[in-house]
Amino acid sequence: MAKELYNTPNLDELENGPWPSFVTGLKRLAVDDHDGADMVKDVLATLETSYVTKKGYWKGGTVGVVGYGGGIIPRFNELKDEDGDYKFKNAGQFHTLRIQPPAGMHYTSQLLRDLSDMFVDNGGSGLIAFHGQSGDIMMQGADEEGVQRIFNVLNEYGFDLGGAGPAVRTGMSCVGAARCEMSNANEQAILRTLVNAFLDDMHRPALPYKFKFKVSGCANDCMNSIERSDMSTIGTWRDDIKINQRSWVKMVEDKGIDYVNDNIISRCPTQCMSVDSKSLELSIDNANCVKCMHCLNATSPLTHKYNDIGDFSGILSPGDDKGVTICVGGKRTLKIGDLFGTVVVPFMKVETEEDYEAIEELAGEMIDFFAENALEHERTGEMIERIGIVNFLEGIGLDVDPNMIESPRYMSYVRMDKWDEEATKWFDNKKEQVA
């Protein structure tokens, strides 16, 4: 006989109102015919108890699969009866498997069905998140034996565990070059290069704290890499924005100059765009363009309407000289508050095998420096705030570049010692690049 749902009046309140409720989803899993249904019932009962007592009953521990030191988030239930046994024994363990997604997060619908069925067929709760904040597929709810069984089947599908704990974490990349017209690099190849190079650091935690990679193909930063990753790789270009003047003029004639001025021209952060009053053609002062992506985003949905048949170019498109900008130190609140990434490589081509090796080498320098110099439970951005960006750049072997900063400082009192040496070094580097 199937186990009955517990009475959960406090959780039931969360099902009221117009918005979807996680409680409704858990109840559906609890009454479905699968091996993990009783686990979900007891999880609901534990959560109801927490709402009554205002206490949390989940604690960490150590759970893993053979050969791995990370990738599992252990959760044990501390809610016991008078005899010291689990009050809700089916929820005594509720561990989470972090699974690395494919680069660009490409799945077939059949694969998603197979993963869902496999999870519950091996004792899982059925609760899956696509994807967690680190980019993982989160299979939430399995006991220790179930964790190993589920992992074994996942391996047969070709999946591997992601990172957890003080380690290199699972990376993320946008869909990018696979389907997006804004892409400036092969995002999937960059991510794959980094993951393959540092997989051992992901599966065997040995760092002071977490280290994350994220790759976005343009400054829209769909992966939120500049805010959420220690090494953020963002696609960009360094030549001129490409303008399809024929389609642009059609759009202005149809939408009207007021619409274009209000929604595109006036919203340029550096005011580097202007429209000729007679020809209606667009001019861009590309030297002052900061690649904010607004004009490209505003015109992209209209391209199909104003392009000639057979013309697949955007009204506005990224330039042809494409590459990436690399930032370090992005993170959410921890010790010193939220941080955006700091530019350390203003522009880098990523086309040849040597280019990918250079990114891998730079990432390795960052991880090694982080491992040796960060304090316990300190992210890369916090370490840089503590030791200074100049020391960090010196430690990873990068020269200071004026393009790393948005604008010069306004303080007139500046130290000028070593100014001549640094200026000479800068011009020598420029000559080497030209050569």
Regions flagged by a language model, labelled:
Residues G124-H131, A164-P166, R204-K210, V275-K278, ...:
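Flexible, glycine/charged-enriched surface loops at secondary-structure junctions
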Residues M1-G84:
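Charge-rich, low-complexity segments
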Residues K242, D262-I265, P269-T270, S274-V275, ...:
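A structural signal for small-residue-enriched, beta-sheet-centric alpha/beta enzyme cores
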Residues E4, D12, L29-D33, V65-G71, ...:
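Small-residue-enriched alpha-helical segments and adjacent helix-cap loops
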Residues A45, Y51-T108, T170-A178, G341-M348:
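Short glycine-/aliphatic-rich beta-strand segments at the starts of folded cytosolic domains
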Residues E145-N155, E385-Y410:
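Terminal amphipathic helices with adjacent charged low-complexity linkers/tails
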Residues G171-C174, F211-A219, T380-L393, Y413-R415:
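A glycine-rich phosphate-binding loop feature that marks nucleotide/adenosyl-phosphate handling sites
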Residues I405-A435:
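Intrinsic disorder at enzyme termini
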